């Protein structure tokens, strides 16, 4: 399924705008090491919307008792007209409610499609820890530049 997910994301709007979680730099450790462990513990899941056995949309979620964390979604642009991402998201919202979840968290990213459904927002803060050394100071300096660029 990983090949299908990467293919979907690569051609999706997130892939074109380089906002993808699967195709970005540094995603290998998450998807090959952490995600399988979280899934084995029941703390993450992947759902897919299929048409004639072919995945046209997928969603990755973080799961805890009473909590559904909407981590990532992507869909094939050829099916945009039928809103496969929205259909999958709505299916998972309904499923989470039926399973007794009291919180559906859209997590990071204030995308328009999330704003249509959310009832509130939380502020996020980045933390960057560095060792006390020349390399640590350099890392701290670089992180400040990156943070300023991202804010602009």
For the regions a protein language model found, what residue spans apply to each?
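A conserved beta-strand-loop-helix scaffold within acyl/acetyltransferase catalytic domains
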Residues: 1-81
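A short, structure-level motif marking secondary-structure boundaries and short turns
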Residues: 19-20, 76-79, 94-96, 139, ...
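Short glycine/serine- and small hydrophobic-enriched flexible loop segments
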Residues: 33-36, 91-97
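Short, high-confidence coil segments that cap the C-terminus of an alpha-helix
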Residues: 43-44, 98-101
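Active-site/acyl-donor-binding loops of N-acyltransferases
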Residues: 51, 65, 101-152
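Conserved acetyl-CoA-binding loop-helix of GNAT-fold acetyltransferases
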Residues: 81-94
